[in-house]
Amino acid sequence: MAQISDSLDVAPESFSTETPNEEAPKAPRAVLNVSGGAVGRRKQAIARVRLVPGSGSITVNGREFADYFPNKLHQQLVNDPFKVLDLLGSYDVVARISGGGPSGQAGALRLGIARALNEIDEENNRAVLKKNGFLSRDARVKERKKAGLKKARKAPQFSKR
């Protein structure tokens, strides 16, 4: 019993509360001096995207990014591929988007940016982009209206008597 109490006195000194830093600090990714382009689609929106090495400015249909997408959620959605690859502020984006609403357009722009980044440096970027689901086209589209129904699935009111 005395042996256990002696080891209890020593135990707090031998253990550290600090966890060792397992991960070495990541070196910033090298920006290739290569431009790339791609097309992204989501719902009814189509985005034609061009990436050029630069300061990180995003221009959509000739307008500033924050003006075109005032919603912070849409801005975050579009910037996700850059954040995952540690390339935020490395490429200028010039995009032309047509069709759809704000959410579909943001999704189309995100897919276009991810595909363009994949095209620029496939061997380093593809695995990370694919793992995070940025290279997958979201195939969900609006279901068509059926004859005899008010909407795609909504039936007219039914009365038994």
From Swiss-Prot:
Cited Pfam families = Ribosomal_S9 (PF00380)
Per UniProt, which keywords does this protein have? Ribonucleoprotein, Ribosomal protein
InterPro entries recorded: Ribosomal_Su5_D2-typ_SF, Ribosomal_uS9, Ribosomal_uS9_bac/plastid, Ribosomal_uS9_CS, Ribsml_uS5_D2-typ_fold_subgr
Please provide one cellular component term from the Gene Ontology annotations of this protein: small ribosomal subunit
The keyword Ribonucleoprotein appears for this protein: yes
Chain segments carrying region Disordered: 1-27, 142-161
KW Glycosyltransferase (keyword) present: no
Task: Tell me the superkingdom of the source.
Answer: Bacteria
- Gene Ontology biological process terms in this record: translation
Q: Which HAMAP family match?
A: Ribosomal_uS9_B (MF_00532_B)
Similarity section: Belongs to the universal ribosomal protein uS9 family.
User: Which named protein is this?
Assistant: Small ribosomal subunit protein uS9
State the taxonomy lineage.
Bacteria, Bacillati, Actinomycetota, Actinomycetes, Micrococcales
